[in-house]
Curated annotation (Swiss-Prot):
Species in which this protein is naturally found: Phaeodactylum tricornutum (strain CCAP 1055/1)
Annotated keywords: Chloroplast, Membrane, Photosynthesis, Plastid, Thylakoid, Transmembrane, Transmembrane helix
Family per record: Belongs to the Ycf4 family.
Listed name of the protein: Photosystem I assembly protein Ycf4
Subcellular location: Plastid, Chloroplast thylakoid membrane
Matching InterPro entries: PSI_Ycf4_assembly
Membrane topology according to the record: Multi-pass membrane protein
GO biological process: photosynthesis
Length: 181
């Protein structure tokens, strides 16, 4: 029975890159905001530089704007980390003949996203590899009605050999063919 159900855990927004950018934007945003406030009140709020000599309009005002924008993006990123947006699992159940895709969303009516598909509606397992400026390497659940449901999380592109191996294992487990999208 254990080999009839497969569950793949999906890491959501709790990745190192999100922690790094949240911290970087928080520190940078605070620095810019304090520099702008220092130029307005002519009081040095930053110990490592003298920002009282900045002219408030336009330098101080622009620094305050960029600082506030950076803090806003940092807070948003921290909230996605705290709420673990995008995490969940993919469950492939050969006993019940179902595929379940479960993800966490933002608070509200759709906090937990549950997509359920019958294995009889699944045509194949697809792999999509795009190179270039924004490379993507993803595994898809290809349905008979021509919809493609992404199964891999948004992350740094994995090695093509690992992606192919993972897709091949899944296709063998579900007894489906593998296709290139």
């Amino acid at each position: 029975m254990q080999n009839e159900i497969r569950q793949d855990k999906i890491i959501g927004s709790r990745r190192f890159s999100n922690y790094f950018w949240a911290f970087f934007l928080l520190v940078g945003g605070l620095g810019f905001l304090l520099a702008g406030i220092s130029s307005y009140f002519k009081v040095n709020l930053l110990p490592f530089t003298n920002t009282t000599e900045l002219v408030f309009i336009p330098q101080g005002l622009v620094m305050m704007f960029y600082g506030a924008l950076s803090l806003g993006i940092s807070i948003y990123t921290l909230l996605t980390i705290i709420l673990d947006i995008g995490s969940g699992y993919n469950e492939y159940n050969r006993i019940e003949n179902l595929v379940k895709v479960v993800r966490k969303g933002f608070p509200g009516k759709n906090r937990e996203i549950l997509l359920t598909y019958s294995l009889s509606n699944v045509r194949a397992i697809g792999i999509k590899i795009t190179e270039g400026l924004n490379p993507t390497r993803s595994i898809y659940l290809c349905l008979k009605d021509e919809r493609n449901i992404p199964l891999t999380p948004v992350q740094e592109p994995t090695a093509i050999s690992n992606l192919e191996e993972e897709a091949t294992d899944l296709a063998k487990f579900l007894d489906l063919r593998l296709e290139n999208l």
